[in-house]
């Protein structure tokens, strides 16, 4: 059953936060979880900020550059980094909170972090943002939970929009028209499927497919949502905080994906992905050169460049339209930072998150990693290959969708993934399987005292 506020489920979170003690939880604030005007940070007294991140070690260079940049402005602030995996984040962060040893700043698991918003673990940054004249909604590409129930709980880092990577070399060898040939990149879902049919082949004639049309996260409800949105439907009712994957528009879209995956084999299966990544020693299927189209986020751009090198020519296309009146609706996401309310160094912790979100931190991100959330620094990233990388920035100028997030989003996703795997394996009828998954996913939904998406419609249409 969907619950607006499940005290049984979040009371242990609230109790854990309360156990940290009123003095620690308030720490220069007017009340728990809310920052006051704040007094100036002493630039002479040494301060250590404990920073929890799930970024892998290959991104450590960016973090070190951030630390150097922060030191130039705040020489007394030292940042100690703890790196964990995203898979262990929820458990480890909650244990730290419950034991009274939480970090000061966290790189969010944005699909779970709202549970800590609503239980008072995170600092409401509204007064600090106002003090520093930061306008998040005007100046940043947002991912959906920086602002939650009228409060500011996070500062942006990256703008993680989705588009379609494509293998130009594969299309050329097959004698197929490049969608960018006319300089417009205007294409449809029908175009993508037609091209996918022509390149899906058993190239070595050993009886097994070894080249595919599309790599798509078909076991992830938000990635499938891009197709449903484009067709005019949705997988969630944001206004009423519930999943609707059992509704006609979703059922029709899932049936089509079933046909492309199971009947026509245009979409490479997860088992086939594992096999070709092992054979080619690559970290995703597109980089093997055996897939024509990969629906993925901008964060893949630099890793694609490193792993593909000059093996084949590739570029980026916008998510394909359904028709001339129904544009493609891609997914956008992002990974913001939050400050822990119990931090004894709140101002220093905030300054770390603020530096990352500020012009210098965002330029470092653009030069070393991905598309920054700060709009004024996005052009720095757009100088990187491929030719049409700007497609990722342009996502925010057209209709787009976001993840449907609640306190236990990850749990709902696990239910969905298991359900569609059974459906696509022929173990469960599609409609019955999605209806049961929808029921179970909705049982996991929990949120706080407000309707967090009140007034929001998907797709989001930029003003």
Task: List each model region and its residues.
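Extracytoplasmic "Venus flytrap"/periplasmic binding protein-like
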Residues: 66-138, 147, 151-154, 172-175, ...
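A structural signal for short loop-to-beta-strand junctions that line the ligand-binding cleft
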Residues: 96, 104, 132-171, 212-213, ...
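Long, aromatic- and glycine/proline-rich binding clefts that accommodate carbohydrate-like moieties
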Residues: 75, 310, 314-317, 366-418, ...
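Extracytoplasmic/periplasmic solute-binding protein
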Residues: 32-34, 149-157, 162, 172, ...
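Hinge/lid segment of periplasmic solute-binding proteins
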Residues: 41, 110-163, 190-191, 227, ...
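Extracytoplasmic/periplasmic substrate-recognition and gating elements
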Residues: 68, 72-73, 78, 174, ...
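Short, low-complexity disordered leader/linker segments with a strong preference
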Residues: 1-50, 447-463
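Glycine-centered hinge/linker elements that transmit conformational signals in sensory
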Residues: 193-197, 239-275, 319
